Amino acid sequence: MKKKQKGFTLIELLVVVAIIGILAAVGVVAYSGYTSGAKKSAAKSNHAAVLKYAAAEMKKCNINGGTGSAMKAPDGKLKLSCSNVGTNNEVAKATVAALDDFKNPYGVVPATGGDNKAIKLGTGSAATACADGTKGHTYVFDDGDTLYVQTCFSDATADTMSSQTMVE
């Protein structure tokens, strides 16, 4: 009496391995799309938070009649006096200092060196803010009258989000 062998043939095993390979390839592509979308959403959220924070803090100065203090850092230290609100780049500097703990969702550190902070002080030109190594950074600058916020979604000026609000 001959025993019947049990098991899978080589062809069956190869088919299973091929199916697993196809599923893995599709899953990696889909996962990559989800993570890039999440990073872009986080950068947009940082952008909106900067605008809301700066506007809310500047309104405090308006409520107090232009006196007192606004924009305190998380450690409670004063970053901007209401009397300096109209001074060139003072609102931007205070905003960057107050939101110092925001991290870059892309994890990109500038090619020139530096850190992984998401909110940075801009140079004063919306057209030149995004360059190599700036993906995920939100740049804040003001000219004394207008606060400009620009977020870079790639290392080029084409894929950005820009906003501005009046400095009051």
Language-model regions, residue ranges each:
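Short, contiguous, well-ordered secondary-structure segments
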Residues: 1-3, 56
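General helical secondary-structure elements
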Residues: 2, 35-36, 40, 48, ...
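N-terminal single-pass transmembrane signal-anchor helix
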Residues: 3-35
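Intrinsically disordered, low-complexity segments enriched in small/polar residues
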Residues: 6, 29-32, 51, 104, ...
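Compositionally biased, intrinsically disordered low-complexity segments
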Residues: 18-20, 29, 53, 94, ...
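Membrane-proximal N-terminal amphipathic helix
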Residues: 39-65
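Periplasmic/extracellular, small/polar-rich flexible segments of pilin-like filament-forming proteins
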Residues: 56-168
